[in-house]
Amino acid sequence: MKKQNIPKEISEFITKEEIVMFQELQIKIAELNNKTNLTRLIKGDDYWISQVFDSIWPFKTFPNINFDNKKFLDIGSGCGFPGLAYAITHPNSEIYLIDSSKKKTDALKLLIKEINFKNNIHIINDRIENLAHQSSMRNSFNIATTRAVSNPSTVSEYILPMLKKEGLGVLYCGKWTDEENKNLDKTLEILEGKFKETKKILLPRSKGTRNIILIQPKNLCPEIYPRKIGKPEKHPL
């Protein structure tokens, strides 16, 4: 396997065995990219910082929170980040990867067949607006997240209905302003959710600023949410 310039910040987070798995994942994604346009972030720092590091650091940086042995949901998983990154670093957790694109979920199924994941991994081709109203899925996850949607209010409407009462939503944000904080606070009030904790870092090698916002249910989310397909994105709460 070709030697790569892997950022030291990643080596501080994960084991050598996990690095090997991430290298295998990189190779397989690159192969699948020839048939299915999964991602352009597959080489060098684009992969190791923008994909791997960005996916795993939230689960390594809150020492007071146990992220192991959980039921984990990745909404709009695309090429598998952050879900597969979390799977590699938390092998005792059960993973659900959801995407509305059948091409992408078919590619994800190939990935998990060819890489020796220790987790029980489920791939589902559907919209979260549909799945959230299925009794077998709603209020059943310890952790739910997505990097596919940027608006925190929209993300919250997708995530909170999926969480158990003690569950945790992980929101990936770039900039984080007072106005965004105010808007999210209003949304959480509607969805019966609350803030838990926030953290901000500068990604290595000048890859930008990242804010992580942790939210959780105050009570179970009202049954009417999420709204019908398209509404949470077009008309955030």
Swiss-Prot record:
InterPro entries in the record: rRNA_ssu_MeTfrase_G, SAM-dependent_MTases_sf
Location(s), subcellular: Cytoplasm
Keywords assigned: Cytoplasm, Methyltransferase, rRNA processing, S-adenosyl-L-methionine, Transferase
GO CC, alphabetical: cytosol
Chain coiled-coil ranges: none
Pfam families per record: GidB
PANTHER family associated with the record: S-ADENOSYL-L-METHIONINE-DEPENDENT METHYLTRANSFERASES SUPERFAMILY PROTEIN
Matching NCBIfam families: rsmG_gidB
The protein, known as: Ribosomal RNA small subunit methyltransferase G
Organism (species): Prochlorococcus marinus (strain MIT 9312)
